[in-house]
Design a protein with these regions (language model features):
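ATP-binding N-lobe of GHMP and related small-molecule kinases
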Residues: 1-127, 131-148, 153, 157, ...
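C-terminal nucleotide
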Residues: 1-27, 52-85, 182-329
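Conserved small/polar residues in nucleotide/adenosyl-binding loops
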Residues: 331-333
Length: 333
């Protein structure tokens, strides 16, 4: 990320003066896909790509925002109830509203931002943007009184309330809590977390952009979540203590099979197995067993392709190609 580039665009677009610069990273998730909104475990890590924003209070009640990458400009009043039409501006609008709900006296500001997280590549450019502005508003207007846990929730609430995505907490948590050289095992129910050093000596983690873009709000994301909730509802008939798929065993799922559609059963089966895979990978990492880590990653891709059905031809091809070449991991959805 180039701070000077963002600064030069800010100076050019606004009044020739400078403001404060804030940045947050994107993320990868080594394993634990679609487990976060089921109360399970995930295993993300921050990356060296992210979002940078320059921000300067403007003495009004209006936010003036410029997307450098999209060359688009939006203004909105902080008292407005309706979010801007531009999808990117909804993230900034949502963060402002959510911070105000938490008692931060947000005032108008000028801002320009840019990033080097590939958009739509599953590396959480939106969470990086939300975290950047949550940090900024907390610093500029909130005396940093909002803690990091709550800043992550600000981003999640922004997705829920202003962007139409009923997401879990993983993306925002990884952006806020990410630490160089480590992955984070996050319990998405309790928000307890543990850092695991990641130093795959003898191996290299390769990130490949399939160039297939995804849009969570317009994809099957919300439908998958509904399938998980339907499976939980069926299991609850005999096990009322169950709240999320995190609480369900394969035995309990099999017991309720007659009340679950074939499609919903497959979705739930994948999630239950994936939650266990995260724990298995953490155990393997502590032993330095990267062969097992790679095997579990391959199992994850197979499950996402055949059970959760969120892969695509391009990713399946990349996964098979890597496997044929002797690699130990899998293509990342």
């Amino acid at each position: 990320m180039d701070i000077e580039y963002v600064r030069s665009r800010f100076i050019k677009h606004f009044d020739g003066t400078t403001g404060a610069v804030y940045a947050s990273p994107g993320r990868i998730n080594l394993i634990g896909e679609h487990t976060d909104y089921n109360g399970g475990f995930v295993f993300p890590g921050a990356i060296d790509k992210g979002m940078i924003a320059e921000i300067k209070p403007n003495g009004t009640n209006t936010v003036k925002a410029y997307s450098i990458d999209l060359k688009d400009y939006v203004e909105f009043g902080l008292n407005e109830e309706e979010a801007p039409r531009a999808s990117w501006a909804r993230y900034i609008f949502g963060v402002c509203r959510e911070m105000m709900k938490r008692g931060v006296d947000v005032k108008g500001f000028n801002t320009a931002f840019a990033g080097d997280v590939p958009l739509g590549a599953g590396m959480s450019s939106s969470a990086a943007l939300e975290s950047t502005y949550a940090y900024a508003l907390n610093d500029l207007f909130g005396d940093n009184k909002i803690d990091k846990f709550e800043l992550a929730k600000v981003g999640q609430s922004t997705e829920h309330n202003y962007c139409g995505v009923n997401c879990g907490i993983m993306d925002q948590f990884a952006s806020v809590f990410g630490k160089k050289g480590s992955l984070i095992r996050l319990d998405c129910r309790s928000l307890e977390y543990q850092y695991f050093p990641f130093d795959p000596q003898g191996y290299r983690l390769v990130l490949v952009d399939s160039v297939v873009k995804h849009e969570l709000a317009s994809s099957a994301y919300n439908k998958r979540r509904q399938s998980c909730e339907a499976a939980v509802a069926a299991v609850q008939k005999k096990h009322p203590h169950v709240e999320l798929l995190r609480d369900v065993t394969m035995g309990m799922l099999e017991e309720a099979k007659a009340d679950i559609s074939a499609e919903d059963y497959m979705r739930a089966e994948y999630v239950i197995e994936e939650i266990q895979r995260v724990l298995d990978v953490c155990d393997a990492l502590e032993k330095g067993d990267y062969e097992t880590v790679g095997q579990k990653m391959y199992e994850t891709h197979h499950g996402m392709s055949k059970l959760y059905e969120v892969s695509c031809e391009e990713l399946d091809f990349l996964n098979d190609l890597a496997f044929d070449c002797g690699e130990i991991g899998r293509a990342h959805v």
